[in-house]
């Protein structure tokens, strides 16, 4: 107990005691002493109140100073300057206060935690307008990375693609920066394929659509963003699905901006085992083809329903890529295709998708296709699937509406149709801007 509290209690005791004695003895001197002590008690109460208010104001001042220091350390001044220079009126991006984040997460309550990793924690946040967001608490490696962090925040804030999780804003008044993203309700693709909470009901049509959406999003990052972005950690855990199973590429914590005048970057290896480009792993040279490799692994997961890396599987099949490629070469792909999706009608489409996956995971990056080419091939595959389904349903309309010169005897579209679908894929990428 503090000294001022002790003095206060003692004073009250003496006032009460003297009052009792004065009443008994009818001593006017004691009454005066009581009055003096009572006033002293009031003065002590006043001093105590003033001290309390002073401490509150000091704490508020210290907190304000601390927030300002964090804001500057995390690059707040630089961000405001860059936003002004970029024309912030065209960027839908908000800088939140620490108080905003505390209220949104109910004081960072553990019940609000959506997920955790070695470098981050994601909270569910509710903003004053009742909109739900995902708040990611991350950390900077050192102060030398501040400018790079701000650059990436600026670039990501300008991405407005329907298949990329939208960065809504950030908070820099905390010890570590907080990033605020749109909230996606349906869990990750990993959850749907492998998680115990989901009984996977993803049909082949769903999986192909997800692959097309993810491929289009990555192609946009590589070719459509103001500065090419290499995601560097494409995996099923970083692909979120909304209530309509629309795919959203998420988690840009490992992403790198690639200057227009550079073919590749020399950087410390970062990524996830099972999805990590072996060429990047051995050379430390990063370019867009590393994302192509990772996407190929995701496509293999969609086809097989198996994890990218699983030590519970036999030695020959621990790594999905090597297992998948070998099965393809030995013409036994049917052994690893997910039983939930394979049927007589979609065998050709699944095998075509498997071929694309194998091409994406070639050891040499130069032998892999670009993501814009992958997106175009998958779009073409969907067009073929749609056309086959339509022809099966309305065979009598084939000659009248399509013309015999458009569809071959095997049901494949002509080269003209392929080019048209490439244009569709390019249009989708452009439309994401």
Swiss-Prot record:
Domain Protein kinase: start-end pairs: 108-391
Keywords annotated in UniProt: ATP-binding, Kinase, Membrane, Nucleotide-binding, Phosphoprotein, Serine/threonine-protein kinase, Signal, Transferase, Transmembrane, Transmembrane helix
Function: Putative serine/threonine-protein kinase that may function as a signaling receptor of extracellular matrix component.
Chain residues that bind ATP: 114-122, 136
Pfam short name (any one): PK_Tyr_Ser-Thr
GO terms under cellular component: membrane
Protein name according to UniProt: Putative wall-associated receptor kinase-like 16
UniProt cross-references to InterPro entries, sorted A to Z: Kinase-like_dom_sf, Prot_kinase_dom, Ser-Thr/Tyr_kinase_cat_dom, Ser/Thr_kinase_AS, WAK-like
GO molecular function: ATP binding; protein serine kinase activity; protein serine/threonine kinase activity
Family: Belongs to the protein kinase superfamily. Ser/Thr protein kinase family.
Membrane topology field: Single-pass type I membrane protein
Catalytic center residues: 233 (proton acceptor)
Phosphotyrosine modifications at: 181, 280
Subcellular location: Membrane
Catalytic reactions on record: L-seryl-[protein] + ATP = O-phospho-L-seryl-[protein] + ADP + H(+); L-threonyl-[protein] + ATP = O-phospho-L-threonyl-[protein] + ADP + H(+)
């Amino acid at each position: 107990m503090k000294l001022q509290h002790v003095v206060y209690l003692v004073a009250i005791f003496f006032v009460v005691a003297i009052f009792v004695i004065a009443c008994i003895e009818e001593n006017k001197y004691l009454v005066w002493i009581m009055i003096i002590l009572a006033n002293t008690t009031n003065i002590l109460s006043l001093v105590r109140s003033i001290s309390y208010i002073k401490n509150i104001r000091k704490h508020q001042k210290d907190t304000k100073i601390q927030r300002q220091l964090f804001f500057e350390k995390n690059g707040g001044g630089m961000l405001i300057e860059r936003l002004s220079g970029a024309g912030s009126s065209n960027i839908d991006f908000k800088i939140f206060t620490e108080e905003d984040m505390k209220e949104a997460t109910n004081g960072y309550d553990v019940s609000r935690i959506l997920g955790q990793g070695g470098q981050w924690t994601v909270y569910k946040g509710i903003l004053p307008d009742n909109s739900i967001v995902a708040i990611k608490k991350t950390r900077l490696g050192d102060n030398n990375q501040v400018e790079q962090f701000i650059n990436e925040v600026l670039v990501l804030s300008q991405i407005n693609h329907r298949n990329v999780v939208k960065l809504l804003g950030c908070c820099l008044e905390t010890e570590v920066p907080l990033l605020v993203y749109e909230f996606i309700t349906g869990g990750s693709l990993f959850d749907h394929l492998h998680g115990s909470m989901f009984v996977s009901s993803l049909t082949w049509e769903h999986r192909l659509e997800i692959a097309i959406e993810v491929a289009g999003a990555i192609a946009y990052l590589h070719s459509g963003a103001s500065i090419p972005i290499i995601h560097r950690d494409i995996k099923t855990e970083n692909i979120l699905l909304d209530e309509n199973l629309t795919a959203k590429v998420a988690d840009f914590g490992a992403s790198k901006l690639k200057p227009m005048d550079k073919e590749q970057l020399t950087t410390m290896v970062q990524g996830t085992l099972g999805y990590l480009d072996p060429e990047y792993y051995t050379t430390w040279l990063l370019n867009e083809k590393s994302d192509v490799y990772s996407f190929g692994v995701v496509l293999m997961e969609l086809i097989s329903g198996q994890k990218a890396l699983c030590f519970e599987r036999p030695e020959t099949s621990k790594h999905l890529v090597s297992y998948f490629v070998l099965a393809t070469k030995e013409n036994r792909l049917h052994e690893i295709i997910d039983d939930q999706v394979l049927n007589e009608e979609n065998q050709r489409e699944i095998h075509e998708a498997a071929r694309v996956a194998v091409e994406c995971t070639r050891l040499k990056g130069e032998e892999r296709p670009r993501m814009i080419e992958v997106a175009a091939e998958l779009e073409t595959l969907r067009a073929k699937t749609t056309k086959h389904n339509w022809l099966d349903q309305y065979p009598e309309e084939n000659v009248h509406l399509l013309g015999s010169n458009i569809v071959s005897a095997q049901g494949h579209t002509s080269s003209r149709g392929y080019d048209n679908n490439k244009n569709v894929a390019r249009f989708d990428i452009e439309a994401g801007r």
